[in-house]
Each structure stands twice: as C-alpha cells, then as structure tokens.
Amino acid sequence: MQFKLIKNLKKIIFLFLLIFPNKLNASFFEDLTSQIVENPKRLSYGVSVTDVNKDGNFDFVVTGFGYLNLALSYKDGKLINIVNENIFSDEFRRTIGVAACDIDKDGYEEIYFLNTDTYSGTKKYSDRLIDFDGNKFLDLFEVEKNKKDLNLTAGRSVACVDRKGDGTYGVYVANYGGPTRFYEYSDDVIVDKSVQLNLAKVTGGRAVVAGHIISNKMDIFAANERGANFLYKNNNGKFLDVAYEYRVEDVLQNGRGTALSDIYYSCLLYTSDAADERHC
C-alpha cells in the first residue's frame, strides 16, 4: 500500500511540474487561426514544415484524409494554399501522415505522403514521395525504377531519420497490420532497407519520433497499438530495440502519439511515455 501511495504521489508531482509552467507562460502563445484564408471543417492528421516551391520560404504542408493536401504559405500576412496540382493535393488517396527531408541529397527536401485507404493491412494506393523540379511536382514512386518496394500497407505516421549522422536521410514508415518500412536512396534508386536495419516488425503502428534519445546519433521511438512500443537505439547506423531494457514497451496500453522534449530544462530528452534520456 505504501509503495502504491508513493508511486501515485510521483505521478501527481510529475503532472504538476508538467502543467504548472504552462500556466505561467500561457501568454507566450497567440491564436493565429484567423490568418488562414480558407479554413473549412476537414479531416487533417498530419503537418510538416518545408520549402515547398524552392522560393526560400517555409510553408505548412497539411494532409487531407479524404480532403485536399494543402501547402499553406504566408502572403501579405495571410496563410493561403499555393499548390493545386492533383499529384500533390490528391484527395482520394486519404493522406494520413507527412514528413519532409532531403532524401536524394540535392539540397532540397522531398515530401513523403503516407496514404491510408484502409484501416489495417493491404491498401489500394501506395504512398507518394513528392519532388519539385522547379516547374512541376513529381512523384518519385511513379518512376519505374522506384516501384519495386512500394508501400502497400496501411500506416499511421512517418518520420525522417539521419541514421548515419552525415546528412543522409531516410523515412521510417509506421505501418498498421504489416511490416515497418524504411526508405532511402541507394545507387540512385529508392529502396526499403527495413530488413537490413532490423526495423521490419509487424505491429499496429501509430506514432513515431526520431532524435538523440539514448545514443549520440538519431534513435527512434515508436508508440504502437495492440503490441509493444519500440525504442530503437542507433547502433552504428543499424538499430537495436531496447524498449524492454528501458521499460517503455507498455504492452497493456495503446500508443497514439509521442513527442520528444526537454521538459525540465535539464539537457535530457524525454518521450511522452517514459524518461528516455541523453546527455547534452
């Protein structure tokens, strides 16, 4: 009984420390929703920030689940959609996740759209990897040489990962009812390297975040549903699941979202589920 009381007290203290600073700094945030010119009700499950059209300005890429994908850019103090090409807006593929990073090392970020037209397992439409050539948008997954490893499994989240620490990015795809994917450019072809990187696990993937969690390179934390969470430690560019050792498997709970933050300003990173850390 005493142990239980101590455990509950620790939870209360943790929540207090988490919430109380936010109360003090609430005035730091300002609601700018009115700056969005067209903002009807819609289903949007993902957002990323990148320079969509190579004009030197950052834009918001907002996914549409049965609605148009948007690229919101500031014009005269207002956020307006600047992309209307079908290959980008693509309302019928039901985009649920998005991430942007420079996969082909051309100096500009590509946009990975994770599409999900079914709840779990095999889906009809593959994902898109959008590149802008200066005039029009292209889906690199529609290039013949890149079709070998298309993702045809329902998914929920994507994250960009620089696993080697040299600026070479890959995309971790958290699938639901099928194996995880990890896409990289290799010999000028987009390939799935999940098997050789020890990432090809089957689960109900929900959320994923990448960062310097427990090593000096980018690690991966994946919150899952109907199964254990994954905590992948970067082991010289490959990954080792250490969720059990760090007690973040949480098999009795369904993960939905996750984030990394130095919530105590202590130079330690924490996930939303447990105290995974690194030293600054």
Predicted feature locations:
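Conserved small/polar residues in nucleotide/adenosyl-binding loops
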Residues: 270-275, 279
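Blade-edge motifs of beta-propeller repeat domains
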Residues: 26-42, 73-93, 130-153, 170-172, ...
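Short, solvent-exposed loop/turn segments at conserved positions within beta-propeller repeat blades
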Residues: 66-67, 120-125, 177-178, 224-227
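Bacterial N-terminal signal peptides that target proteins for export
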Residues: 2-13
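Glycine-aliphatic tripeptides that mark coil-to-beta-strand junctions in extracellular
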Residues: 56-60, 107-111, 138, 167-169, ...
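Beta-strand-rich domains and repeat architectures in extracellular enzymes and scaffolds
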Residues: 36-63
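Beta-propeller blade termini
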Residues: 45-54, 95-105, 155-165, 206-214, ...
